[in-house]
Amino acid sequence: MDGNGRWANAHNKSRSYGHRAGSENVINIVEACCEINIKYLTLYAFSTENWKRPEEEKKALFQLLKEFYKKEIKRLISNNILVKHIGDITAFPKDTIKTIEETEKETLEKCKNPILTVILALNYGFRDELKNAIKNICYDVKDNKIDIENIDENFIKNYLYTKDTPDPDLIIRTSGESRLSNFLMYQASYSELYFTDILWPDFSKDNFKKAIDEYSNRNRRYGGL
């Protein structure tokens, strides 16, 4: 979800205004996923690098997170949409953490066979995820819970935040940037990439479906012929 700040600048608005516009666009893309039967949607909402942002901007982002969860919870449940997060949210404000955890618990209890799982990447960065995975593997080796010889790529996946979700088939980045920026680097090994100059608040359902259509026409060989 990239380009909120630049969108705000283009409209002579504050960065917080841009983030709000970006937040409001999330539901449009969620609806698009439901319309074309996509089962998982991961949104990069707050990266480990976002702590470098100005204090007021971070406060606005945390407030928007709370508002999003509280405002959309009924709609998500009524449409049988499960909400989860990946990343370490322990450094977030306590009231934000409480809202996130309560919403996730409620959707888990009420959405038994979800048509879509929405995953918000919050205080997420792959380098941080990898660090934590390596530490936890080392702890388990030290405690004789695992044998080093049994460690393979499938084993490593069980120590990642995304252990319960499939690897992404397609990664879409808005705003004209052509890099992954520390996002799901292990999981994206064979993901298709789609880059667009459109800023996130302007990224419509039609734009999303166009990206999916282009992806559908690609020949994924996974290193083979």
Residues of each region from the PLM?
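Flexible, compositionally biased loop and terminal segments
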Residues: 1-225
